């Protein structure tokens, strides 16, 4: 048989394909893998994401769908600016070079993208539209500017959204984030908190884990606000938020955030005290939940940290008893949650209990329960109210409803929901981003740029060695004229957070015209299958859901949910390698040392990361094994949602398997002149069952199971010798989504002028799948002996007995039986 010249095969097959054609008469299917940042190099982790999407796109085309499968570049961002500083290259040039390189890599692996729709977010043709969106949001009251205390990354010298602060550090730089107050633009995502939360119920095609993460981040708390008057200050009060209003009679103190307005208004803290609390206050993105602990998804352990409070000079009055309660400024009360003020009921809240113990505050139980241990708070929402005046004798839920009605009727409070979700800060102090289309005029104040003057583009000549934002220091770009009065004005020198660009790109792909074309969006949106990492659950996916709603409100599109189904692929992992000094090595470095006889420590299989150097270069793999082997292996072992361990042995096995397929087909092609082999009924039933299972697995995106079925069919055809044009076509048709180059090449040999790409999927006979017989493979010491047909209801003993006759007099040491699949006899004597 001929050698497996995959490079020649890839070149041949790619010359046949046209991925830009579409038929609007067919039912649409929109499959989209999250578009990449153009870092310049694709690794195996990228491969898995994109191949999953490509397999699905090819399969759906074969089912007759009009498939939209586009690609683009998330091209703005800080790495390009860093390259400009470190390598003295303009961000645009750096980005364009990387895009060209990655485009070549993506095309080399046979991804069936419609390249005619390719977009780049750093192109003025793209960001002109998002500048229009921003102006529409501004007009609709969805965008606003205010002085705000922000998360400042001192290394990247930019503002970070709460979601971009992880354990107090910048999500990119890892620097400890500090607080600053500067003017910032915001989008009113908080106005959509309830809608975003309820919308999750309709997303039945999303993983529950992602929906839970978004639910926690939105952080809805149902409760009430209650007014506590301030002693000595007529008609002044503190409005507290609580999810447990029924425990009001157990209140022994009130506490406010260090950022509560009263701290400044009543001069409650010295500068030193204020700084102590600012440092001690736990991350404000982890919000307070009166029931018992934090409801957030990060820093959960902080609920156990020391509760620090500074006793103020004022007291507040209990709204029912009139008792005076001490007021603290405390490190566990957050300005961004509820009203920034709480009442403390130590007997029924773990955090309040810890605070009360530290400051020797009263602890009065107002819920009677079987629990008699007063050394611990009773936090469950059940029991009978006691020591609670008019609430005594009521069940907790009944008392909660009653107290809310009471405070509403006498005008000291009302039912209220609070949300953790804060408005999205979109200003970034960097050059390589989309300019914000507003100017500032001394006479007219802030003015939006006229739509006809868009896009506001970036200046080419920029000095990147200056500290902070290069646009702020540009000698000419920021100076312009006011669109209202014509007088001198200054441009806003901030640029949009790059998540602004990625929050609508899926809609831009719907039309080749650019921007959002409503009719095209009606045709293709929502995305039917969106594929990407679970690390985007809160950031990108939540922002995109909000942005879609904002675009809907402004009349651009008709949908509110952008992604019907979501697949979060698992990470690609690899062994780590270290030299004798403990330094991490790239796989090729480790191999080189081993060849020299030097010691290499092989570590556990971990997520691929540049820091541990356990990354595998995609170009090297494709060059050595071919695109099809890389595609086939990356989907072969685990379900797409699970992590995947890369190994040289695995990719080599996939390469050899594809070579085996090539040899099998060529064996048929070389012998077909001798006449077609008639496929027996038993083999037909087996093939029919494989097609049935394969179709089911493809529909369910169980791609590793589908790969197993390809193996099963190859084994069946090899063992039975049932090689015919019909059976070979079945093999190539189900192989094509996974190894398209080889399948296309062999299909051209099978029949002239036939292109496999886009041809109909193979059908199966439902009646044959109901057969009462099953065909098993009989093996001896792992080697194929013969196929054996048995009745489905045969016992294991009967099957083994029948199979044993096929190995004659061999001495059997052990029998491995896989129901419905195989009997393997391990024999010490050949017989």
Curated annotation (Swiss-Prot):
A motif ('HIGH' region) lies at residues 36-46. It comes from Neorickettsia sennetsu (strain ATCC VR-367 / Miyayama) (Ehrlichia sennetsu). Its main location: cytoplasm. SUPFAM superfamilies: Anticodon-binding domain of a subclass of class I aminoacyl-tRNA synthetases (SSF47323), Nucleotidylyl transferase (SSF52374), ValRS/IleRS/LeuRS editing domain (SSF50677). The keyword Protein biosynthesis applies. CDD domains: LeuRS_core. Pfam families: Anticodon_1, tRNA-synt_1, tRNA-synt_1_2, tRNA-synt_1g. It catalyses: tRNA(Leu) + L-leucine + ATP = L-leucyl-tRNA(Leu) + AMP + diphosphate. GO terms for cellular component: cytoplasm. GO terms for biological process: leucyl-tRNA aminoacylation. This is Leucine--tRNA ligase. A motif ('KMSKS' region) lies at residues 607-611. Belongs to the class-I aminoacyl-tRNA synthetase family. InterPro entries: aa-tRNA-synth_I_CS, aa-tRNA-synth_Ia, Leu-tRNA-ligase, Leu_tRNA-synth_edit, M/V/L/I-tRNA-synth_anticd-bd, Methionyl/Leucyl_tRNA_Synth, Rossmann-like_a/b/a_fold, tRNAsynth_Ia_anticodon-bd. The gene is leuS. GO terms for molecular function: aminoacyl-tRNA deacylase activity; ATP binding; leucine-tRNA ligase activity. The keyword Phosphoprotein does not apply.
